[in-house]
Amino acid sequence: MARNKIALIGSGMIGGTLAHLAGLKELGDIVLFDIADGIPQGKGLDISQSSPVEGFDVNLTGASDYSAIEGADVCIVTAGVARKPGMSRDDLLGINLKVMEQVGAGIKKYAPNAFVICITNPLDAMVWALQKFSGLPANKVVGMAGVLDSSRFRLFLAKEFNVSVQDVTAFVLGGHGDTMVPLARYSTVGGIPLTDLVTMGWVTKERLEEIIQRTRDGGAEIVGLLKTGSAYYAPAASAIEMAESYLKDKKRVLPCAAHLSGQYGVKDMYVGVPTVIGAGGVERIIEIDLNKTEKEAFDKSVGAVAGLCEACINIAPALK
């Protein structure tokens, strides 16, 4: 029986970490791709040489020609420029939009049946552009954002309450940026909503708001500490969770930047919402009820994403 094939487009810190995690989980054979010849080949060889020690059997290769991704079942896109201190995700738009055009053409030619996960920032605009450039069905192209943002929220909550991260569920809606919407009402500790924990005296509203703000600033906090790059371990783990749900038809309920066609009152945009990911790609978008405050915050986030998409169209009118 043929193994699944996973193409990792971009061989930087996230790409290398993705290759290692996909190998450890034996999700399939792996191709690390990058236009910088030598880097994917070197990283592929290095990770392959860890397989006898760590006990995984996959064929892991590096390549600098798009033909190497031919027939991939999953493509995870990290290609582009990473953030540096003082930069917002949006500052990357012009540079990375050109990268998405090249990547989209490569996927369209060699892996038109793949499930595509985009990580490149500014995420919501880049995954929207990538879907347009590639021509793939919208349900087969998704952005990795909500899993990461929710994971950060879960960690901060677990530390605050001194409980296991496994007993914390968290919910983050909207764009992957400063306007993201961590929803306290739909986030729980041991099944108890955060809003109830405020009433029970576990945490004050003010402290909860501080945790929510730290979640929004989660990426920038790491960029500020690293100084020469951005997060890669948690983003890679988040994308692998999505890929695994697709490859194994697990039908996980995961918050992702998904294409909306009327849901939440939004059309032809990628925004972070709860989805079900299975063998059909994004099989369902779950619409939850939002109160007035939550809806206003979500609409503000959607507006920020819409502005980025407009900026993309100004640079590449073919996207219209």
Swiss-Prot record:
The active site is at residue 176. NAD(+) binds at residues 10-15, 34, 96, 119-121. It catalyses: (S)-malate + NAD(+) = oxaloacetate + NADH + H(+). Keywords: NAD, Oxidoreductase, Tricarboxylic acid cycle. One of its GO terms (biological process) is tricarboxylic acid cycle. Substrate binds at residues 83, 89, 121, 152. GO terms for molecular function: L-lactate dehydrogenase activity; L-malate dehydrogenase (NAD+) activity. CDD domains: LDH-like_MDH. InterPro entries: L-lactate/malate_DH, Lactate/malate_DH_C, Lactate/malate_DH_N, Lactate_DH/Glyco_Ohase_4_C, Malate_DH_type3, NAD(P)-bd_dom_sf. Its EC number is 1.1.1.37. Belongs to the LDH/MDH superfamily. MDH type 3 family. Catalyzes the reversible oxidation of malate to oxaloacetate. This is Malate dehydrogenase. It comes from Rhizobium leguminosarum bv. trifolii (strain WSM2304).
